[in-house]
Amino acid sequence: MASLEGRTALVAGASRGIGEYMAKYLASAGAKVAVAARTTEVTDKRLPGTIHTVSDAINEQGGTAIPVVMNMRDPESIAAGVSETVEQFGSLDIVVNNAAILVPGSLESVLDRHIDLIWQVDLRGPLLLMKHALPHLQKA
């Protein structure tokens, strides 16, 4: 594993699943990690994990992580999440755009409001994250 000592990573969608594992992997390689997602508390037992449980687990294993509240539907939240990461760690070198939403069912049965939600979380949010992160990534 290549060393990421001195690097800072922001992982969106890091409260569970692939994002959680990416955050933990990057931390194990030495990166400081901003664990970003909107999940601050478990509201559905089928979806365990929060930004706090993931960042706590990283810190308990000797890594460096902070929880960052970031709602991919909210442009201000995305900008604030990038700013908080840079303020806390001093730089931003890596972005993992992992946040996504899945609405089960066929295209024929999906509601229009769910299409809007998918658009906001799966396309618009990641583009906004890259827009706000790009100036910091270019400095890295």
Predicted regions and their residues:
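Canonical Rossmann dinucleotide-binding motif of NAD(H)/NADP(H)-dependent dehydrogenases/reductases
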Residues: 3-36
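A glycine-rich helix->loop->beta "capping" turn
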Residues: 61-64, 84-97, 103, 111
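A short, exposed helix-loop element centered on a Lys and neighboring polar residues
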Residues: 130-131
